[in-house]
């Protein structure tokens, strides 16, 4: 199971929200690139970045910060948040982002996905489905789609999408455990590669998700649980923090040259 640390960027800072509520914002670091390096030191193999400002406005105001992250780590970076055009996708891929996530636009403008799949490889474009009780939520989770989550996934599959990032928003940022049953139901019906998200609290959640591998769930995005140091191994990493540089043998990470 690939564990993907999440970095949410708001006003240029690394933050975490609770259930997507901007009024419940906690700032963890002023420089998101520093956060990326910390996760890489702890042997992250991929990073999940969300531009919260872009999600609100559609403007890529944090692209410089994201570019800095890409330049400073030697692992793939996937980016989502307010991506609504081919030009936006191109801009991210041009700075070295490995994978771009289409969210609300998959519902409001499915032709965008169709166009992107004619231009880019399936490995470069994924769709994020944020669902509540099986219904996709869009536009900052303020509106509901008129179809079920798995129905949206199957439409995307027909267009060539191979992977879905599936978030149970009732669990997101709540530290109440992964939405195991909702993720299982979705993965069974979609029949696609699935990255789970929302609610991971501790290692027991990760062990539970291992049971969903046969349904295509092969990775998980972890946010607040990592930031709140809910995993015992993090105590080891942080106890040696002053001695570990990005290119130190203690980590498999290597600084980009």
UniProtKB/Swiss-Prot annotation:
SUPFAM superfamilies: Ribulose-phoshate binding barrel (SSF51366). One of its GO terms (cellular component) is cytoplasm. The active site is at residues 8, 130. One of its GO terms (biological process) is L-tryptophan biosynthetic process. Pathway: Amino-acid biosynthesis; L-histidine biosynthesis; L-histidine from 5-phospho-alpha-D-ribose 1-diphosphate: step 4/9. It comes from the Bacteria. HAMAP family: HisA. This is 1-(5-phosphoribosyl)-5-[(5-phosphoribosylamino)methylideneamino] imidazole-4-carboxamide isomerase. It comes from Chlorobium chlorochromatii (strain CaD3). The gene is hisA.
